[in-house]
Amino acid sequence: MEVPMPESTINEDSKIFKLPEILPIMPIFHTVAFPKMMFPMDIVGNRFIQLVDEAMAKDRLLGLVLTRKAPSAEGPLCQCEDLHRVGTCVSILKLAKQAGEKAQLVVQGLARFRIVEFLEEEPYIQARVEKIEADILIKDLEIEALMANLSTLFDRVIKLSPFLPQEFAAMAKSIQEPGDLADIIASIVNASVEDKQKILETLDIRQRLREITLIVNHQLEILELGSKIQSQVQEDIDKSQRDFYLRQQLKAIREELGESDENRVEVAEYRKKIEEKMLTEEARKEAFRELDRMSRMHPASAEYSVATTYLDWITSLPWNERTQDNQDIRQARRILDEDHYGLDKAKKRIIEYLAVRKLKPDTKGPILCFVGPPGTGKTSLAQSIARALGRKFYRISLGGVHDEAEIRGHRRTYVGALPGRIIQGIRRAESSNPVFVLDEIDKVGSDFRGDPSSALLEVLDPEQNFAFMDHYLGVAFDLSHVTFITTANILDTIPPALRDRLEVIELPGYTQDEKLRIAERYLIPRQREANGLTPEQIKFTRGAARLIISGYTREAGVRNLEREIAAVCRGVASQIAEGEISSALISARDIHRYLGPVRMISDARERISKPGIAMGLAWTPTGGDLLFVEATAMKGRKGLTLTGQLGEVMKESASAALSFIRSNAVKIGIPVDFFEETDIHIHVPAGAIPKDGPSAGVTMLAALASLLTNRTVKNDLAMTGEITLRGLVLPVGGIKEKVLAAHRAGIKTIILPKWNRKDLEEIPSKVRKEMNFVFVNDMREVLNIALSRK
């Protein structure tokens, strides 16, 4: 950095210096010249050298003026309009020419001038100028304060700046003229040329002092901030050097004592673990590569802990450690029957897998999906399967999972990265062939972080999961020996590609008799023990259990049933603890004392009391249920109103039913002109619950026919089926759940589509015997059976 050197003394003659009327103008771009200052200049180009030569031949005077654009080496030296109008006249003290059209000048500032007009532009600029005389200023307290403050600030700048010599501070304090002090400091400080030109053009000395004070103060703030940053950096460097020095000393002390280096010990331990672990070849190479990286790191570095965490995961996974499967099929069957009543289809599939495994030991594990309402034993059955197989059990819940990294893990580049939940589960199971339950697979979500269901495609595909790639591990892990069991309430929300990889086993709701046996065999003993009671202290009669099932619960599973049994057990436990009784035999008459009045009263038959009401059957994620359809007519203009939160499919079914009745009005017994001045309103009660699906078509049509023919639908009859405009009755799903719901409600007759006859095989024989099933193919058959005679 070139710093202008002020004169050691202010030449008094400069105050009476006479400025020529015409001056040669040299444009300058990177600096601003001030009076009283002496500084070197480098010039390049023949025209600049020619300008200086002519000035040297005359009076050695030049006008230095700041230009807004850099002077051109070719063409005009500068456009006149680019020049500022205030400059400094300087005297050339020394000229030293150099090779290559270069020269160096030493000049001294004499006085400010203002350009009056430009006279010539070629070969260089000449202008008529006038001298700017310095104001006569009488020092007052404000001027003295401004000068003192400026000198103090400048002194602090000198101390903080590595490029400015300390002599400048003493020189500034020796200057008595306010204008000279402002000019000299402006030429020295590291300010922009625009700011310096502003100081040059400020003729009011008081204002000039204020302006240069602001500039110096800003420069001081920058220097102080830089000094603070430098101090912090130096402290960090000193601490690092100190830590390094202490570690080296500690290392030397340990060597003198014969102790091994901690890093070497840890590396040796990991090497031993890797060699002893039965890793795959790919995993072994990756582990040794990471170990080699770790051996070159300092134990205090962040990367060192990342490497140790990775090696901990690699060496703790059960790469080839498996449990021995139970080959005794009879014992496995006994265990399954001990833990669960019914569920024959799921048990049969597990026994088949065991049989195949016994004949072909290297067979891959099945990927099952248990689908059914809540409380039907999906998760507990998976635990029972693990016990029957003699395997470890692990479960993760996928409900609400939105991040793909939950399945595949995070890449090691991220802070706090870990493997996904699949690999974490395998590690915790400590076996490469556990029974692995993915609970609530139908409730997996997706968002901007990825789609977990897509990541599960690799996990649940037997053709791919032998080389499952977790992002954190970075090596393939064999999942083909894992028995994956997924659970869901419905299949509709599972993506088709994922559903295709699952072997679906439906676990429908239980019948009343099945619930009774489950309560007697499992629920009552479990709650009795959970509440600290013995078999002698509490007993349930069969009538009491039946009343709890029918009067206090209405569900496909047995979860609420167990809660009600637990409530009775707690009530008895309270009485025994208070000394009121020593034991209790719970009969049907006693239930209301513990559970209150009966909550579930079947009013299905009473609800069908007049024309326009029909009873249908619905299937929901929680099991089957009754669905009532109500229809009414009023004067209007052939309008159809649908209420009850119906979905699009149900609305279309209602429109199809009305169109069928209108097109077959004569056959059904309805006047043809009846619809011309009539509005129809169809309502499905429980309006707060959204409803959709095609299976209510026959129920809607029956309700409309009942209304328009003024014939009631039989009150012990329910129906389900999809309809077409031609009156055909098409098959629907969920037959078992719907039939069981009707059976619980005491319905005796059910109308089913003809194509659903095959589904009766899944219904317990006791239920089939107690109910009458009518299979139809056409809506006319439905109306003949469902509508009572006039």
UniProtKB/Swiss-Prot annotation:
Class of the enzyme per the UniProt entry, highest EC level: hydrolase
Family matches, as PANTHER family: ATP DEPENDENT LON PROTEASE FAMILY MEMBER
Protein induction: By heat shock.
EC number: 3.4.21.53
Keywords from the UniProt entry: ATP-binding, Cytoplasm, Hydrolase, Nucleotide-binding, Protease, Serine protease, Stress response
GO biological process, one term: cellular response to heat
A Pfam family matched in the record: LON_substr_bdg
Binding site for ATP: 372-379
SMART domains linked: AAA (SM00382), LON (SM00464)
Example of a GO MF term: ATP hydrolysis activity
Catalysed conversion reaction: Hydrolysis of proteins in presence of ATP
UniProt-recorded name of the protein: Lon protease
Database matches in InterPro entries: AAA+_ATPase, ATPase_AAA_core, Lon_bac, Lon_bac/euk-typ, Lon_lid, Lon_proteolytic, Lon_Prtase, Lon_prtase_N
Function recorded in the entry: ATP-dependent serine protease that mediates the selective degradation of mutant and abnormal proteins as well as certain short-lived regulatory proteins. Required for cellular homeostasis and for survival from DNA damage and developmental changes induced by stress. Degrades polypeptides processively to yield small peptide fragments that are 5 to 10 amino acids long. Binds to DNA in a double-stranded, site-specific manner.
A single cellular component GO annotation: cytoplasm
Lon N-terminal domain ranges (all copies): 23-220
Cellular compartments annotated: Cytoplasm
Membership in a protein family: Belongs to the peptidase S16 family.
Domain Lon proteolytic: 608-789
Active site, UniProt feature: 695, 738
